[in-house]
Amino acid sequence: MMDVSSMYGNHPHHHHPHANAYDGYSTTTASAANASSYFAPQQHQPHLQLQQQQQHQHLQQPQQHLTYNGYESSSPGNYYPQQQAQLTPPPTSSHQVVQQHQQQQQAQQQQLYPHSHLFSPSAAEYGITTSTTTGNPGTPLHPSSHSPADSYYESDSVHSYYATAAVATVAPPSNSSPITAANASATSNTQQQQQQAAIISSENGMMYTNLDCMYPTAQAQAPVHGYAGQIEEKYAAVLHASYAPGMVLEDQDPMMQQATQSQMWHHQQHLAGSYALDAMDSLGMHAHMHHGLPHGHLGNLANNPHQQQPQVQQQQQQPHQQPQHPQNQSPAAHQQHHQNSVSPNGGMNRQQRGGVISPGSSTSSSTSASNGAHPASTQSKSPNHSSSIPTYKWMQLKRNVPKPQAPSYLPAPKLPASGIASMHDYQMNGQLDMCRGGGGGGSGVGNGPVGVGGNGSPGIGGVLSVQNSLIMANSAAAAGSAHPNGMGVGLGSGSGLSSCSLSSNTNNSGRTNFTNKQLTELEKEFHFNRYLTRARRIEIANTLQLNETQVKIWFQNRRMKQKKRVKEGLIPADILTQHSTSVISEKPPQQQQPQPPELQLKSQGSDLGGNELATGAPSTPTTAMTLTAPTSKQS
């Protein structure tokens, strides 16, 4: 760190980081106590304090992680311009308020000072506790952290790295982050940082490369913890999609550091409600992130680091998060935590601050804006945070649903084109009407999906309906309601048929138009059984995607037609008897064994053949059927 501080010109502060630089930031313990008060002032006096703090942080973060400071410093110049927001976010947890301000100010400062590495602030903001955690919260960390972190961070490549691999870079800062909150865990963090420092120092060049290369790995882990914010900080635009990887990168090497950082971030976040609030204030999103991401993930991150690195304060502050991150306490878990907090330049801060100031290039504005915008973004981007932020997961689900459904829907339009043109036309064009006409339940459900299916454009609502309809269609009882969904979705399976059948079967006039497939199956069944048991009727209705009532009425009409034909002498009377007998005798076996399969396969084959073939087996439920359907249908 000495080198780093001298490198960054912060070494004067760097030497007295505990006492001077970090009142709340400098000494982890003090930072824990002072974090909120210090950060609040920092927030208010961001530039001077941020500069001082950042310098102090740099000084201290030379302790805590000069690595990070170097990192941050390096990255700020390079990275900050690109990822000022990202840099700013790093101080999410304990520095969040202060660091967010610091980072924001750092972003400004770094704007002021191209070489943010000169200020540890970025490092500090990034939770550049790497150094600190590595050594004592004080200077000891600087050297060990400093060498690895220093080299690691000193390199302007770090800038690039941060810009590119800010996440990885952040890892070392993760311990830096603990500067404030992690100083309690500074020793652990320091130790981790020392480990990290060695790793970083050895990987100084590598870190940039490895971390970048490792991003995918980190990404995997990071997403779990919603490190998207971290990486997003760094890779806001670049890694926004692949935020996690950067985190892993950090994690792998600086994973402990990251853990520390997350400790720090979490610690400070949780340490001082004011931090969270301040951070929130500074980053409109901190509270939100803290809420959704930070609490769950930052807390976890911080927690894990806390647990790993005995940060009583952080642990106390983040007890609820500790349970979550004990798993993270393992190196891998730590990595995840690190990913969260450190990911990109303190991705954790990002997340905590802005969730992910992922896009946010400028930490301060991006952090606030990104925090506001990215909390959802981060959470949504990090499905892992979905637990913390149900909205995200659910948002993603929504997004995902349409995509899968969209294919189904798109195929639905194809369905009309397929062999069952009439039915599918109904489905596509008349599905809404059909659905309306179809079952009452089906009509309600069907209308939404049908609209979607009919339009051929999957609406989210339509998609959701479709999914529901798929489920319903799959359910025998839901034949009516399923059909609408099936219609909308154009589910290849019975669902689609049911909706098609319902739609096809139900004209605006109220008359049901049966598809050839449906008629074939009904005739086949009628051939064996003129009278259906209710169970069989339900089975057939489900298979053909019809309502029980439709099947019942069809059989009634068919029997009347048969009787009429016999009466007219068109059909031998014995046929009726044979029919009856055969039906009676065969009814149980065929209904139970051959017919159901046949009906299902054929009916589905027909309907699916029509629907599904048209759909191209887009629907999941129909996939199996689709294979069958194409075979039966096409064959």
UniProtKB/Swiss-Prot annotation:
The keyword Transcription regulation applies. Residues 341-352, 376-389 have a biased composition (Polar residues). This is Homeotic protein labial. It is found in: Nucleus. InterPro entries: HD, HD_metazoa, Homeobox_CS, Homeodomain-like_sf, HXA1/B1/D1. The keyword Nucleus applies. GO terms for molecular function: cis-regulatory region sequence-specific DNA binding; DNA-binding transcription factor activity, RNA polymerase II-specific; protein heterodimerization activity; RNA polymerase II cis-regulatory region sequence-specific DNA binding. PROSITE patterns: HOMEOBOX_1 (PS00027), HOMEOBOX_2 (PS50071). GO terms for biological process: brain development; brain segmentation; cell differentiation; cell fate determination; head morphogenesis; midgut development; positive regulation of transcription by RNA polymerase II; regulation of transcription by RNA polymerase II. It comes from Drosophila melanogaster. Residues 1-25, 39-113, 127-153, 287-389, 584-635 are annotated as: Disordered. GO terms for cellular component: nucleus. The gene is lab. Belongs to the Antp homeobox family. Labial subfamily.
